[in-house]
Amino acid sequence: MIRPNTTILPVNTTGKTAHSTDDRPDAAVLLPSVGLLALDRQYAVLREEIRIAIERVCDSGRFILGPDVNELESELARVLGVPHALSCASGSDALLLALMALDIHPGDEVILPSYTFFATASAVTRLGAVPIFADIDPLTFLIDPADVERKLSKRSKAIIPVHLFGRTANMDALLLIAKAAGVPIVEDAAQSILSTWNGKCSGSLGDVGCFSFYPTKNLGGIGDGGFLTTTRDDIAKSLKLLRVHGMEPRYYHQVVGINSRLDSIQAAVLRVKLPHLDSWTTARQSNAARYMELFSQYDLEQHVTVPGDESHGRHVWNQFVIRVADGQRDALRAHLTTCNVGTEIYYPVPLHLQKCFESLGWQKGDLPETERAAEETLALPIFPELTPAEQRTVVGRIAEFFRVPQARQATDASTHPQAAAETLDGPHFLRRIKAVGCADDVRC
């Protein structure tokens, strides 16, 4: 009987199955399949609670901005330590609404990283403003405050740091720069819910925080959704008006807004998930620490650079992104695909080199660290339900690609349970969690 999540590789023309160590001509290898994501595992645990929540909304007939939306907003504000949390239709809309609330006009400049998802820049250009791209810190992949300062001008009207992959940007430096220049900060926290900087949650540090409920996020819905946070009453009032066509009261429009409301069914499902977010985050942190341990055990440091340990807070690991130097990233990814290991490249083409921004005049070489990251980075599976065995498979396949000998310490619990407990689940492993800066006493 074939185990679930396995794939039989066909025999190739040389008479050996791909990646087989068996020289028999008819040998076939069963390779475990490790997906980049496994949303079905999360759903399976919560299936009944989600069903009840959806039926409650359907029975109420309140499908738009219903009671569950109000409750979710209150719960998010409490969890993140902010006075205001306002939901909307997507993380992309959250960015657009934030800039609208800050009264960004055509011709204004907004400084942001080029190494980010497209929505960060598209929100700027939709308002006729100009994205000014800053380079990144090569250790963290986050916007470089020094380059932000260099890019400031009299036309600068906002700064958007992106808390990429689950790590908060250097907000101390950015806040000082923004204050001196008199410009607001919009935090793109789409990938970083519950991450912290010096004890404060992402989304609570700048003027506005923007989050996404896209299903692959750490707190994901069953479709699109997003929300914004702010400590400023005036911005909260504007956001609440802008998301409903600027309408207050009904059919009386004070400003030209957009239609960006969170469905009640999405809110109901997210309320089921929110109490689990902290434990899911802890699981992601444990998985990150285990990867660190495994890469060390396989002596892969000369081939692969794992995420840096520098942190001033809680890293929530929306993605685990490694660097693969010497032009081998794409070949490694192809190898892992053949081995049924899911990966992704975030992001293969920096925004300043995208075709749609050609008119801005950016050239290759303008942002060297951003461009190097786009050529070298590869995301590995990091979802909360990922098992230690699956992680050993992932790192083992990477070691296979680089022809690295077997790991120094046995980590297969099925054959060496005591060694596995000592190396991955024992005190040394727990120390590794602290070492990567992702287990602290902060619970926001």
Predicted segments — roles?
Residues 2-62, 442-444:
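N-terminal "arm"/small-domain region of PLP-dependent enzymes with the aminotransferase-like
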Residues 21-28, 40, 52, 69-74, ...:
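PLP-dependent aminotransferase class I/II
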Residues 60-109, 123-127, 132-135, 200:
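Phosphate-binding glycine-rich loop
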Residues 86, 111, 132, 185-186, ...:
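Structural detector of well-ordered beta-strand residues that form the stable sheet scaffold
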Residues 100-189, 196:
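PLP-dependent aminotransferase-like
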Residues 123-124, 177, 201, 218, ...:
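Hydrophobic/aromatic ligand-binding patch that stacks against planar heteroaromatic rings
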Residues 187-222, 249-254:
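Conserved active-site segment immediately N-terminal to the catalytic lysine
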Residues 211-212, 226-232, 271:
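Short beta-strand-to-turn element immediately C-terminal to the catalytic PLP-Schiff-base lysine
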